[in-house]
Amino acid sequence: MGSFSIWHWLVVLAIVLLVFGTKRLTSGAKDLGSAVKEFKKGMRDEDKPNAQLGDESRTQDASRTAQDEHDRNAR
């Protein structure tokens, strides 16, 4: 009585599919996957030495400044 058989799980799955629909479940799974991916990326970035992170931000700032200057000249 305490354990669930395969039929119990199939009924639960069918009810979940009826309530939420496959579109919501698919988009929810995609969102969860991208959140896990971003979390892992953040954990990897945390392991980098601070000097490397500073160099990357300087490069990004320089490219933004160049892009801003280009946009100003285009006007």
Curated annotation (Swiss-Prot):
Protein localization: Cell inner membrane
Record field: transmembrane: 1-21
Disulfide bonds: none
GO CC annotation terms, alphabetical: TAT protein transport complex
UniProt xrefs under Pfam families: TatA_B_E
Keywords: Cell inner membrane, Cell membrane, Membrane, Protein transport, Translocation, Transmembrane, Transmembrane helix, Transport
Entry's Gene Ontology BP terms: protein transport by the Tat complex
Region Disordered: start-end pairs: 41-75
GO molecular function: protein transmembrane transporter activity
Similarity comment text for this entry: Belongs to the TatA/E family.
Name of the protein in its database record: Sec-independent protein translocase protein TatA
Gene expressing this chain: tatA
